[in-house]
Amino acid sequence: MILSIITGTGHYLPNKIIKRDHFMKHKFYDNRGFKIKKSNEEIINKFQKITEIEERRYVNEGLLNSDIAAIAAKKALNNSKICKEKIDYIISAHNYGDIHPISYQSDFVPSISAKIKNKLRIKNKKCRPYDMIFGCTGWIEGMILANQLLRSKHAKNILITSSETLSQVTDPHDRNTMIFSDGAGAAVLSAMEYLENEKYGIIHYDTQCDNNEKLYYLTNGPSLNPNYKKSLVNIRMNGRRIYEYALTEVPTMLKNMLDHANLHIHDIQKIILHQANAKMDYAILKKLLELYNYTSLLKKDCLLKIMPMTIQKFGNSSVATVPTLLDLILKGKMPPHEIKPGDTILMASLGAGMNINGMIYRFPNKKK
């Protein structure tokens, strides 16, 4: 029986650290285009209390989305020990392409995945580059697509990358700009033969897309400051609606996914959620535990034992948060968190669309 196994992971975090002082001189506006009367100190304090974000990472000038994706991809390939010429697909999850340094417009042609293949110097003409534009849920959806290609014997090794340079598409006059950051993550997924009774790798997944009334909860638009004309591509987010949607939909979807896999929450050793907002992630996990009547585990210290967090130091890098967090744990850089052979983890994300997805992955007891 063919199973989809993660054979390598990698990530890239920019070295430019942006702390709260960076935003102290910003002029913040509300959704009506009026300057907010509160002091920046008040605005930043409230923001940090909700999100827990203390700092975030921005790319250095001249570094493109495809550049950092290629760095993470190379690390994942090296970790996998698989020859780059044996990669059958490159699935690149992102939302804004490469941002032109002068016009600040998104560049999608050629595709990010094709640029990654070029930067990795992969000569194999049968290696197909494929872009996944799916909001912050793109990397998990890319893993789902890769799993289907592997299980159907259309591929043997697939590189799934996720990358974003959100610092280049945020409105400096929008308070929400403080949420976003830059980064990249990657994984190599390979087809491996196992016995029928061995259940490893991707053992279950689910995706839900609410693309009608919720379509514009997260979108693009002009600056909140009517006089700011630097870029027409700015992330626009209805935080309250997204929060309400997440708490209504995500816990139930994850519970149903576990049920369909004949698993209980106590079978899961780690839960890796998209690092969107600390308050929201805690609330999602609490709701999920409440569905199992695990009310004794709702304290924050208990939540953090099963759900590692990086948003405090790295911010929200969209598609890159889940694979980055996974790689950090696997490389022993998130103590006391660890993933041991045989462990089962739950990964989940939500993003523009609105889309939500989840995946259950079990690590093999030993390497093939």
Where are these regions (language model features)?
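Claisen-condensing/thiolase-fold acyl-transfer catalytic domains that form or cleave C-C bonds
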Residues: 66-70, 97-106, 110, 131-151, ...
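Short beta-strand segments
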Residues: 93, 133, 158-164, 189, ...
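Condensing-enzyme catalytic core mediating Claisen C-C bond formation in acyl metabolism
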Residues: 1-62, 173-248, 252, 350, ...
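Conserved beta-ketoacyl condensing-enzyme motif
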Residues: 6, 62-133, 263-283
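Acyl-CoA/ACP chain-elongation machinery
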Residues: 162-163, 210-218, 277-280, 312, ...
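Flexible, glycine-rich active-site loops centered on histidine and acidic residues
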Residues: 154-184
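Buried hydrophobic positions in well-ordered alpha/beta secondary-structure cores of metabolic enzymes
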Residues: 6-8, 47, 76, 90, ...
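Acidic-glycine-rich active-site phosphate/pyrophosphate-binding loop
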Residues: 40-46, 107-123, 160-165, 224, ...
